[in-house]
Amino acid sequence: MSNSNIHPTSLIAEKAKLGKNVKIGPYCIIGPEVVLHDNVELKSHVVIEGITEIGENTVIYPFASIGQPPQILKYANERSNTIIGSNNTIREYVTVQAGSQGGGMVTRVGNNNLFMVGVHIGHDCKIGNNVVFANYVSLAGHIEVGDYAIIGGLSAVHQYARIGEYSMIGGLSPVGADVIPFGLVSSKRAVLEGLNLIGMNRKGFDKADSLSALKAIEEIFSGEGNFAERIKQVAEKYKNNSIVMQIIDFLNQDSSRAFCRFEK
């Protein structure tokens, strides 16, 4: 490999094994038992330690940490492994930690996966192929994730859980049990609880208008009959209330999403 592909500020252990056309940007640290296969690219500030193997064409972004010891009290410096397959995209601040004696001694990631910013993959996890983990997904230890699974942002998965193939977990979901293949799982979504009356008062909105607007949204979202008709009725009833009319204007705009509503 040509040294021109390694930034001079990076620290590469002499015993590290680098394939063809490996590119290593500024301030990376590569340990002596690391193997980087052909066409791996480390953008900058990437740390790869331990007995770790990165498959060809994988791209790792700044401040990712791969192959560090597992976060468990029982860890006794056993020589465990981290194996990552080919064609993976590992974005900023992702952590993938090595296996442990209690989990087969290896954390394994397949091919063609996308791990977005801040993803954590704990010790002894087994990740399949073509999965997508959105921002800040957190996997505890010993988790198995099947091929083509998608996990939404800020979701956390309990240790030893299994996530089946082709399943999808919605964002902000705490997952404490197995998810069947093809399953769709999501936590309770945000619900409308009223108006931000304190904030409105601080910004100088008329208190009477604010309280009237609260009644108006209750009529819109909790009233009887057709939703569109309720919007028209409320617009006519409260046409002199600028707060209500601003809400009505928002409701009448095109949107690809539903509205947060009061909990039933």
Curated annotation (Swiss-Prot):
Q: What is this protein called?
A: Acyl-[acyl-carrier-protein]--UDP-N-acetylglucosamine O-acyltransferase
The record, for Gene3D superfamilies, names: Hexapeptide repeat proteins, Udp N-acetylglucosamine O-acyltransferase, C-terminal domain
Pathway(s) annotated for this protein in UniProt = Glycolipid biosynthesis; lipid IV(A) biosynthesis; lipid IV(A) from (3R)-3-hydroxytetradecanoyl-[acyl-carrier-protein] and UDP-N-acetyl-alpha-D-glucosamine: step 1/6
Q: Where in the cell is it found?
A: Cytoplasm
Keywords associated with the record = Acyltransferase, Cytoplasm, Lipid A biosynthesis, Lipid biosynthesis, Lipid metabolism, Repeat, Transferase
Q: Which GO terms describe its molecular function?
A: acyl-[acyl-carrier-protein]-UDP-N-acetylglucosamine O-acyltransferase activity
Under which EC number(s) is this enzyme classified? 2.3.1.129
Please, which domain of life does this record's source organism belong to?
A: Bacteria
Subunit text: Homotrimer.
* Entry's family note: Belongs to the transferase hexapeptide repeat family. LpxA subfamily.
CDD domains named in the record? LbH_UDP-GlcNAc_AT (cd03351)
Q: What does this protein do?
A: Involved in the biosynthesis of lipid A, a phosphorylated glycolipid that anchors the lipopolysaccharide to the outer membrane of the cell.
Q: What class of enzyme is it?
A: transferase
What does the entry give for GO biological process? lipid A biosynthetic process
| One cellular component term from this protein's GO annotations in UniProt | membrane
Chain ranges passing through the membrane: none
